[in-house]
């Protein structure tokens, strides 16, 4: 029987990063993955392929709507080749997953393909695709099995017309009318992809606003921008049935007045979040306990109820984000090596990769009000930037929330071009407990989108933004 210092079940961003860090720290490491490719949801059917589709569809939209204004004239009709677009997406996925294989080899990590299940707290059975079972032993084990799309109890996912994000990334045709159930990150990103390609898109959301977990100002601005892009929204609608009839899908929902509303389309994307994936893990055999939501219970060091077993990523509490899982994977590896790492969960940024992009870190205005914290806010519009006007990306703003007395930055919320990258500046500043004045006095290159961060900091510092 092969023996290891650490075995990791699941090869998503949390699992493979944990494996690499463990190996770097001198531990004999194994990783177990049930699929034939490494990388988990993120690399195979999540973050990476959805960004590939977002970029491809963005190019198409620019070519059909914006090139002429830039003085670029393309003779003839511009067409979408969806098959080729999806093939390119798959090539990006293939390159990325092969890159993870390379990293496993480079770091001398043993990879097992199959379903890993606990025999006890130190032994894992690996059921391979050919039906054979192999057993390994590990001093420490990390559960990194991730999540899968959630649904509603009354919805039957046929994966043809009533689909999840996985199927939405490999459709054979552009929908005529895609109805998206859920106004969160996944629904909005994939809804925007197919809207750009020519589909009619209607987003049906139970809450009274989209991206409800983010600052209300971001929700309001993104709604306004996406309505301008002709995406339709049915907010405060409670879906009660989804029925397929041939090539049509009929969705019935009650609006906020309790009146029934019927939506008809040829595809329904169910994007109501994700849930922990622990099927077949047999965690009870190792003494691992779960909460009422099916998440693995861990302490502040991410240790489970079993002394040598840890859990990271989507299977435990907190935001279901790839970069959160990566930080947790690194943290556990370093704890096992006797180090004292830390994660500030308040400083894990959240991003929506629509265009304009939406990004945030720290506290929202709603959270500060609820906690009774006295704060000041500074906001700066993207349209006031020369760089934004040059690129025609004028939607959005940057908002900085700072403590009224100390000026420490408590939250940064932004929507606009390249905000997914800009948010890193805010994370860095907040990690070092910067004040709004600190950011306002840093030189930002001109002309850039990042100048909006400086200007918002100026606005939060005695309301002295320069360019509005």
Q: Which role does the model predict for each range below?
A:
Residues 1-4, 20-174, 202, 207-211, ...:
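Glycine-rich flavin
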Residues 7-14, 18-35, 48, 53-59, ...:
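Flexible, glycine-rich terminal cap/loop adjacent to redox cofactors
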Residues 1-12, 174-184:
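Beta1/beta-strand and adjacent pyrophosphate-binding region of the FAD-binding site
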Residues 7-9, 116, 135-146, 181, ...:
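Short hydrophobic core segments
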Residues 15, 187-188:
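N-terminal Rossmann-fold NAD(P) dinucleotide-binding loop
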Residues 155-175, 262-336, 440:
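FAD-site-proximal beta/loop scaffold in flavoenzymes
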Residues 19, 23, 191, 195-196:
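Gly/Ala-rich phosphate-binding loop of Rossmann-like dinucleotide-binding domains
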